Every structure is written in C-alpha cells, then in structure tokens.
C-alpha cells in the first residue's frame, strides 16, 4: 500500500511533476509536501454533498440516516479531511430501497462525469472555488 507521507513516494511525485493530481477513495490525507506539487492542485472526488458527510463511509451514512438526496462533489484538496474548496456538485434523489452497493455504483458513474467536467473547467480556467 502506498503511504502518502512516505518520503520516497513524495520524491517520485516531485520527479513526475504532474500538472494535477486526482484522488478518489484514497483513504489518506495528503500532506502539504504533496499538495504543493501540481500547479493546478490536487482534486478529490467525494461521494456526498459536502460539507455533509466528510470523511469515511459517506455512502453508508447517507443510507443509515435516511437521506432523501445525496450527490457527488469535486473539491480542491487542502490539509484537512474533505475541507477544501468545492468545485462542482451534482445532487440527485435517492430511492428508499437503495442499497449501499447500488448507491456505490451510481456514485461511481456520476463521479466520473463530474470529474470529467471538473477537469474541463480547470483546463479552461473557469473552475470555481466554493468555500465549505
């Protein structure tokens, strides 16, 4: 397993000099030494309507709490846990009978679409930074 704070990993990323880093379900908070590498930032795809359900298992919490709506959010990463400025959010209604597995699959598809649009906006210089 890759450790985000591993010095060798950070050095490899610096050598690669990426323009942007995209993280999906990584499960680790990126240190400032990584966040500062890409010129267009580090982007996270989070499967909730931030700021609600930051952190782990947002799909499960949405179902446990009986939410009627949920969604996918892209955000610029910062040193906090899902606290960075939001870029795009897509909201949708939930079926009362949806399972975590079904919602995961729906989020995967929606998340890919939102990520593609986010990257297009960043490339054009039109991406917004919406504080949480």
Describe the predicted segments one by one.
Residues 1-132:
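One-carbon transfer enzymes
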């Amino acid at each position: 397993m890759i450790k985000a704070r591993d010095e060798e990993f950070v050095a490899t990323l610096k050598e690669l000099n990426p323009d942007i880093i995209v993280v999906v379900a990584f499960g680790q908070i990126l240190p400032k030494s990584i966040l500062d590498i890409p010129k267009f930032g580090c982007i996270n795809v989070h499967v909730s309507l931030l700021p609600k359900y930051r952190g782990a298992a947002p799909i499960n919490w949405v179902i446990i709490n009986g939410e009627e709506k949920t969604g996918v959010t892209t955000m610029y990463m910062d040193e906090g846990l899902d606290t960075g400025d939001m870029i795009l959010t897509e909201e949708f209604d939930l079926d009362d009978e949806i399972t975590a597995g079904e919602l995961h699959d729906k989020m995967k598809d929606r998340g890919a679409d939102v990520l593609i649009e986010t990257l297009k906006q960043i490339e054009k210089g039109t991406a917004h930074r919406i504080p949480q």
